[in-house]
Amino acid sequence: YGYDKNYNVTSVTDPMGYVAKTVYDKDNRVTEETDALGQKESYTYDKDSRVTSITDKRGFTTGFDYDAHGNIQVVTDKTGLKSHLEYDKNDNLTKVTDALGGVTTYGYDNMDNLVTFTNAANKTTNYTYDLEGNLTSIKDPAGRTEKFDYDEKGRLTGHTQASGKKTTYDYDKLNDLLEKSYQDAKGETSEKDVTYAYNSAGERVSMKDQTGKSSYEYDALGRITKVTSGSKKDVSYVYDDADNLQAIVYPDGTKISYEYDLNDNLVKLTDRNRKVTTYKHDALNRVTEVTRSNGTKTEVSYDAEDHITKIVNTCGSCGKVISTYEYKYNDQGYVVGETATELEAGTRKTPSWEDWYNWGDTQKETDKADCEHQEKEIQTTRTYEYDD
């Protein structure tokens, strides 16, 4: 670790030698963070040390305005669009109006527990609690209810799904889960109980279910190093100095190995047959390229909101593009258009189809067009509906 004269941590060098840096202002507030790859995020503050803006690794800035109680009142995104937030007298968030005018509301009881949530489509979910503030039920917009039971220590002892299926839980004196039992809607046992055992450090050392018993071993850092299944065969786990999983070793001696970049992103995977898959990432740690052992490559593009906009698959042996998928989104982040083009095996013709979606206020597609058949392309429009 490195420090400034005010004893703020200014640099961290991990066991692999990678360095992350932090810059502070005269009031010891973080103003800039730089990761091991040199990517930066910066922050500004008001006179009350509240964050007023965040500029991310892409250079996009999000701004924040506050009310008299210090609650975030306005959020301004990178395009200048604003979302407005409202609160009750206890500073509970009660209303969010997004940049498109969509309204989400929240309701609370006298204990400040959330009891209603109404989304922008005017669909409401209801919540109830016991006197200790434990969540006892959730009723979704379709009227389906799931319930929760607790013991005197506030530990979850039962969960009943809307279908009537129930799972019960039993604990030891240290609050470790000892047993899970299952019942169907008629109250009859539906699956064999699952039991657990722990060591003095609270680490789970065994589990017994309908498939048999499995045992677990750990290293000094609490990382699992070995799993022994009911067949008495061991699977071992190896880690690098940055705590990333480096290898899984199987009873027959084969293994899966993993390699990572400075930001702990997976960059190479070698499977049990020694076939290699490699991965590339952008500055935001998003996967941008996957190359498989046969040379087949997948390239992925994103927009500023992290939506996938394009996927291109390329043949490893011939180098030709074998499929392309493009996506368009509306301002609410829902897919409104999909274009897919694939190379047809054997004939080398390229059938294409394009799907366009019209989302209603409840995010259900409302329009459907005719299917038009052409000599080389098939163009269709699909419609989808979603439950609550």
Annotate the PLM regions.
Residues Y1-D14, Y18-D35, Q39-D56, F60-D77, ...:
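Beta-strand elements of repeat-based all-beta scaffolds
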